[in-house]
């Protein structure tokens, strides 16, 4: 089975300042299943990835560890590659953005943008650390909250009261890096003039390159108006210097997606493949990116505009997935559910997770929840109980009674053909990234096979020597049906498929190799392909995750002494009201702000809340929350905020307060 199609597939590049966790693996497993599906179809499908190895966090972490950024990123890259290999995630090339290939391509693209008039210079003001002599991102400034007087709060929001503000609003601000008091300073930055490409992007986003949910989201951003994109950072910075501009570097988000091209360029140089065939503006090949919903803006707006403006092809499609939650909540270090890949591997088989994620991924942008009771049930009941059990039950008789040789004919060709008839539908489900549908169809087939074996009862027939031929035929049938099932599951379970090929004594299985059954064929002695999940191992994994990630005590957020106690009269001054969120939209140009319109029954108020990273706008609309209704309005650069919504936080997540059923907009909270 061969095809003339040529495809290049990428996953988002993991950041090179920490180890992989299960949230990363959702995307990389999703990508790997899709690539394996196409390779089994005989399509030239090349997958590349690499580490995102630039930026301030990497520079500072390396300094903290007393090593160079190059040494840090090299070490993390090895860790990432080791984890990917353990989970059978098999990229054709895995590179790094800190590479000669990426520097050449980033410089080329920038110079083409500059020559085309797409780069503009603007002066901006931000906090500057006079000791470290560097500009400070918001998260590298801390001080006392201007709202509640809680100390040691970040420069963009307070984790005690939930207020959002600018770093310059902090009381007694200090640099997280040096402890010095920062000063405001101007700097000239380089911007990509994204609004010039608004019509091109509108056209591109409406031609089926994105999921419908993403296209709808982009429509909101178009309505709000596109902004020029800051693509430069000031020294000191770990990244590529902008040619001819002293002390200026490309922002990490400029060269990170170019890293896809750089990884492929390295692959081409080593394999003799044409880079231009895949990246030329007139390319007939296909280009696919798998990304999380948090980086859609970069991949569906900046990236295609930058490619088109610099003379390269644009993506065939950008496929977006949701976030991973654990037991219905965001991953949490304190609960032990922030699980690193290495902690999982210390206790559980990697293909349990591949199977579970496949059973939940549906091609939409929905979040995926890892529920451990469901995890145990799906693996034990479906994968082990239904699929592996078929081979186990039938192979025992073939191994012991028939010298490992299958019979010379099938006793139920119709059932064999019934399972084969599901092939196109299973392939279609995998290709459309609806892996959950594929798994359901495969398990339906497995049910039919188990019903066949249960109805024929070879273990009963085997007690009668005169019926051994029937036992032989039934078990031969079972082995051939298992062969079909494991072929269907091969993109999801490549390790188990390989072990099955060895057991079946067959060539590598692919979509077109299973039409002809194995008859009068010698198989090998069966060895267990997969064992059941033990709940104790899950508990041990959670304990390890909690212990390993909580070695540093969490600093308690406490307000200043005089603010510890208030009188009931003081509390009574705060007018807390039930509010209904009638509209929500992310604030363009602000990392964390969401603009909320709140209905108080007899009036509506606008509030800016720092919950953008915790919630999508769509999930907020219509829900009830609690707001401070008599807070003095505050003018921000995005508009006037007329109150504050209440949320809880542990430093790892933000959780909006929501009243019980029966509460109505405008009710006082007492």
Curated annotation (Swiss-Prot):
GO terms for molecular function: ATP binding; metal ion binding; methionine-tRNA ligase activity; tRNA binding. Belongs to the class-I aminoacyl-tRNA synthetase family. MetG type 1 subfamily. Binds 1 zinc ion per subunit. Residues 570-670 form the tRNA-binding domain. Zn(2+) binds at residues 145, 148, 158, 161. Disulfide bonds: none annotated. This is Methionine--tRNA ligase. PROSITE patterns: AA_TRNA_LIGASE_I, TRBD. It holds the Pfam family tRNA-synt_1g. A motif ('KMSKS' region) lies at residues 330-334. SUPFAM superfamilies: Anticodon-binding domain of a subclass of class I aminoacyl-tRNA synthetases, Methionyl-tRNA synthetase (MetRS), Zn-domain, Nucleic acid-binding proteins, Nucleotidylyl transferase. It is found in: Cytoplasm. ATP binds at residue 333.
